A protein has these predicted regions:
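N-terminal secretory/targeting leader peptides
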Residues: 1-27, 35-194
Length: 194
């Protein structure tokens, strides 16, 4: 399956710090660095996880809100749905937002009832939750590059004959190409929904 890799390598969560890495190319250069290669090796050693294809782009995280935001000052007092990441909460609080930890399944009604005035997600995630029905504005903050990996149990991978391993690695690369194409198309599609 796919996963946000940094959840399992919390020492490297800085790669997901808001505004730290704000474009896809830089993120992929970091992900392909020796430092992160060591992390991927630690997954195999500690968790028995095999990264089949490297990171694939899921889109840029953006803020969507019920009101137009034109400057950082406009974040002051904005009630923003946030996940439980202490790093993300503190970053948005430092910018003036009031962060409200909510699960995604509560997002729509929380915006509808005024519990929150917006959220930050990849547009596809907000879109599939029907958020465009209750907010009008997309703020192109592009504050986090959203990337996931496709992985499997490393012991199982190692037990397979070499041709099967090669087929899985090839399929992983094909899945990345397809997933990135879909991710870019979805980002454009959902941008039009607001």
């Amino acid at each position: 399956g796919s996963m946000p890799w940094w959840l399992y390598s919390t020492d490297y969560a800085w790669t997901q710090a808001p505004f730290m890495i704000t474009d896809r190319e830089t993120y992929m250069n970091v992900y392909d660095s020796d430092v992160i290669r060591q992390v991927r090796q630690s997954w195999a050693d500690e968790y028995h996880v095999k990264d089949l294809c490297g990171g694939f782009y899921r889109g840029m995280r953006k803020v969507v809100a019920t009101k137009k935001l034109e400057s950082v000052e406009d974040l002051s007092g904005l009630k923003l749905r946030m996940n439980s990441s202490a790093l993300w909460n503190s970053a948005w609080q430092a910018l003036g937002a009031v962060t409200v930890p909510l699960s995604l399944n509560e997002l729509y009604t929380s915006i509808q009832t005024g519990v929150v005035e917006g959220c930050e997600n990849p547009l596809s995630e907000s879109g599939y939750l029907n958020v465009p029905e209750v907010v009008d504005y997309v703020i192109n903050t592009d504050h986090v590059v959203e990337v996931a990996i496709i992985c499997m149990n490393n012991d199982l991978f190692e037990s397979l004959p070499a041709p099967y391993q090669e087929a899985l690695l090839k399929a992983g690369q094909e899945a990345i190409a397809w997933g990135e194409e879909q991710g870019e198309a979805e980002e454009e599609q959902w941008l039009k929904a607001y």
